[in-house]
């Protein structure tokens, strides 16, 4: 054992080459990040173009490192540029000055309007910043600052990185940075001074030059010339006579009825306050040299009028109150309310109305003793007051959220047919001044799933929006909705069509509420046709109709057939006009007995010969070409029932029911039977109109593709046409064959209705009655957004702003995606409303600037165009150069704005009165300067000198300074030769 332990005792020392201290580990992490980002060596880029800092693309990369438990974020900021040729990259000469040092002397991008503060202060295109990761953390002590700066210096030296590396110190709001840039034998130190108050000796150029020269400490005499760039910024806040032109809407006129009801169909537009709060004028002297200009505590040559460059930017008011945005936002807030109409208004007028008519004896007396009401004496103009009277029975007038004048104006706007003393003639009324239906604006409702801009639904949305904002808020909305629902019931009960709705089945491209109103109109049409009791006989129709091309496509399931109502003879009247008013369900017992007596039950088992003995019924007109196959009689087109119109929620319910039947054979069979109700009805009508017909006859008319004819040669050698059913019609247990065997010869007028208008109308009215204001707002919000977009487009067309056109297209694209979903998210809806408000504010800013610059007052067309272009640039660009500086047309207007503001602030007499004053002495005493003291003064001093010794390499030196009322900052970049020092 002793022998074995001897070698172990010889191992007495282990050399540890790992980075031991936290400081060394931190330096290693910095080097690792620089290597990962490939920031090693010198890569010379192209010279910077003028304005590239603002127009170019800036990108950044970030990583996180830590010093012990203190976390730092490392961020690489760089301007995206085209890479230079490889040959240029390979030429990494030892004496080449790093790119960042060369950028210190660049003059093409002084005072960029929008850039990182280090870009503005030092003119760099690329740099790395190390800053505390947490916003609240800060490097405050001098020792920590020096430790970080030493770490940066070592990391740059070890890696050979030539990109400037900065460390943020002190609190973040102070924007204090120190840093370093290293190259082969050269180094630039970035230093900074930040004070609250400007020292008196440094309030002018001469004092700043003294600092710069002393900091450089150049041993040469005379000192090489210093290049100077100066910018003074003047702020205009008092616009004086240029009042904000927006006029608020006249609410009193609306309430008092002085304005027509059409005002309710118009949305307000514009900002309630001036959306332009300040105008900043920057006067710049870009290339000056020391000795040419004087600026000290006694005298200054820096007159803004004489500045060679003027540029302007406008400061926009933060979130200006905009009428259209407020309207839509307030309406959207209703979507989040939970109250029902009953809770808002108290006891429901709908329930009370139901209690009054609930007495069964009263209902029976209506049936046994009907009172005759001449329709022509019933004035339509009275119906706008009916709903109001019903509500007043249960609620005092003084409790109503809406007063009578407002309510009457709205109802007349929604129902313009109420002005007429004649009942409706059965046509749907629409406005004559609507945009053409082919126009892009009119068809926006397809994209937004709202409603046409001339529809009742669209008008209702606008009225509710205005009521919510001006006349009672949520209570007013609930009141108007209650009135609207009662009006719908009144129209249903009295057979008055609802105006402002397109005829035909519900349009599934529109919102659900619009579909419901269209469904109610369909019910009113059917009920009206039935109640009028118009009857026609098939014999009255002459045989002048052309042959029918067929009813269905090549689908097997009847529900999937193409629009059969078009193919079944649109020229004929609908089946409703054939029905008797007494036959509510078309199942009279006498008819059934008659059918049995006539042997119509034989239709199930008997052949065509037995059916041929039946009396034909329900014929519409004779087919022009076809005859029955078995007896050669002419084939007659029957009167058929129209398919039941459906809204999207009913279609969805039907789809769910069919889907629940499953995929089994029994489920599929049951699903096919449910879908074949319309097919069965048409077969029964066909059998009644064509006694002795066969399934082949029906298929030849209903689905010609399923009857295949081919030429064959008969026994005598003649070419004849022989036909047979298609392969799918011969499939065993075919639904068409089953339906044909089940179908009885019953004309449409005696069939059970496919569409029960009474039941469907009551379902719609119940649906409307139970809608909460929040549900209503959800239904109508697409219409409100649609109206807002149309309003914005209309206002933009007056201003012709290209940037606004692009934003409107984006809003339409975004809205069409969001609103097509059944229940869009609130956040996405808020985004759309916010975008609309931003566009409204943008148009308001354009109008504000046009008013201030007096574009309409320009007599010369060229000057007017220049001003309009200038205003447009102010809206779209962060800073706009004034052509001709203070001597150009725009410059003179800006000068005048400042002069007027100065005189108003000093309470001096106008210019005309100053001219009348006697001596020049008096005029001088009463006059004020044209411009206020500059709000900010910026100086950039540059030179190239050898440092630290006369024989050192001449390197770039730069100092940026900014002086404001409460801020004084110096940012210096001082380079030195490190070859022998």
From Swiss-Prot:
Family, per entry: Belongs to the Rab3-GAP catalytic subunit family.
Cellular component terms per the entry's GO annotation: cis-Golgi network; cytosol; endoplasmic reticulum membrane; endoplasmic reticulum tubular network; extracellular exosome; Golgi apparatus; lipid droplet; postsynapse
Keyword Endoplasmic reticulum recorded: yes
Tissues expressing the protein: Ubiquitous.
Associated disorder: Warburg micro syndrome 1: A rare, autosomal recessive syndrome characterized by microcephaly, microphthalmia, microcornia, congenital cataracts, optic atrophy, cortical dysplasia, in particular corpus callosum hypoplasia, severe intellectual disability, spastic diplegia, and hypogonadism.
Entry coiled-coil feature ranges: none
Originating species: Homo sapiens (Human)
Lineage: Eukaryota, Metazoa, Chordata, Craniata, Vertebrata
Subunit structure: The Rab3 GTPase-activating complex is a heterodimer composed of RAB3GAP1 and RAB3GAP2. The Rab3 GTPase-activating complex interacts with DMXL2. Interacts with LMAN1.
Protein name: Rab3 GTPase-activating protein catalytic subunit
